[in-house]
Structure formats: C-alpha cells, structure tokens
Amino acid sequence: MPRNLIVITGSSGVGKSTLARALQEALLPDQWLHFSVDSIFYCLPLSIVERVDQQNDHAIVDSKAIVAAAFACATTLLELGHKIIFDLVILSETGAQGLMRALGDFDPLLVELTCSWNEIRERTLARGDRTLAEAEHGYRLAGGHLQPHCAFDSTGTSAVDIAAQLVARLHSGTRAA
C-alpha cells in the first residue's frame, strides 16, 4: 500500500510548514494536502488568534478540542483517499499517544525536525506571529516523544534540500533515519 501520510513534528520555528510546502512541490505530480493543527486554529476569530499568539494566552481556547478536530479532519481526508502532510508540535508523551491513536492506523512516515535555539529565535522574531516565550517553551519540551523514521536539523539545511532527501526515501521505501 503506498504511503499517504507524512507527519512532521518539531518545535515552533523549526520549519515544519516550510518543509511541508517544499514537500508538496517536490512530490508533484502527486497532490499532497498540507494540514495541521493550525489549519483549525486559524479558523477562530482573528481577535482570539491574535490574543493567543501575541499574548501567549492559551486559556481562551480549548486546545484539546482544536487538536481533536485537526485529527478528525485529517482522518476524514485520508479516508477519502487524499495524501496528507500533517505538521504539529508534540509537547508531551500524551500528545504523542494522541497522534498515534488518531492517525497511527494510516502508517505515517514520522519526520522530526529540529533547529538550534539561536535560529529559532531569529525565525520567531522575523515572523512576529508568536512570542519568544512560546517558542522557547516548545523548544524545551518538543522532541523525544515519538521515534521518528527520519530526523533532520534545519539550522543550516534548506527545506528544499530536506524535501529532496525525504522524497528519495519515499521512492526507495527507506524509512529509517
């Protein structure tokens, strides 16, 4: 059965979404949808999104419901035959277990993306869509909760180069890092 799910994990600012977009292009003519927890989060009213992102105020949203909705949407898309590149931050063992409960039956290729703190700091400041405190929180807690098939450090490697390596692994059937 051909693989139809790639899951990219890592802290905020490591380049998960950038890698997902590069993979979409590299995997053409196959059409892969990029989906994430943020796909649901950014459906919220702008004032709530800005409060969460700029003030680091997560108390105003039901994060568990947003994650569950993202998993449910991804599951539906996969069941309908779509190919998905799903990216998310996993901060705990519980989060990793939730991901695998929701999407594990689809035999995902698990990709872990890391990056140096200095690079994440620069990227976060350049983006301006979240606080450094949130980025640092993710940097400290993300990673190590899943055993990835492939792991990459995006500090000095472009998303296009990482995507090319992943595509080569997908085409060769190689799963191990």
Where are these regions (language model features)?
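P-loop (Walker A) phosphate-binding loop of NTP-binding proteins
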Residues: 11
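Small-molecule kinase domains that catalyze NTP-dependent phosphoryl transfer to phosphate-bearing small molecules
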Residues: 123-177
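ATP-binding Walker
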Residues: 14
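Hydrophobic anchor at the beta1->P-loop junction of P-loop NTPases
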Residues: 8
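Conserved substrate/cofactor phosphate-moiety recognition/catalytic segment
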Residues: 21-71
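Walker A/P-loop
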Residues: 17
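Glycine-rich phosphate-binding loop used to anchor ATP phosphates in small-molecule kinases
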Residues: 61-107
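Conserved phosphate-donor/acceptor-positioning beta-strand/loop module used by diverse small-molecule
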Residues: 104-123, 152
